[in-house]
Regions:
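Compact, glycine-rich, soluble single-domain proteins
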Residues: 5-8, 13-58
Length: 58
């Protein structure tokens, strides 16, 4: 399985993400433990499987 680290403003904000959904002017992510975090006002700008990063921008 591939888990991603969520990067915002060059810093890791959330780890082990297996789900991401852009909705309502933001992005909701969930990790392997089922914990969720919403990044309001952000959008997904890059997904890199080789470096396991999901990059967000405001």
């Amino acid at each position: 399985m591939c888990e991603f680290n969520v990067i915002l403003n060059g810093k890791t904000q959330f780890k082990d993400v297996i789900y991401a959904k852009a909705e309502g002017g933001g992005v909701t992510v969930k990790n392997i433990l089922g914990e969720a975090k919403e990044f309001k006002g952000c959008k997904i700008v890059e997904v890199d499987v080789s470096s396991t990063t999901l990059v967000l921008a405001p």
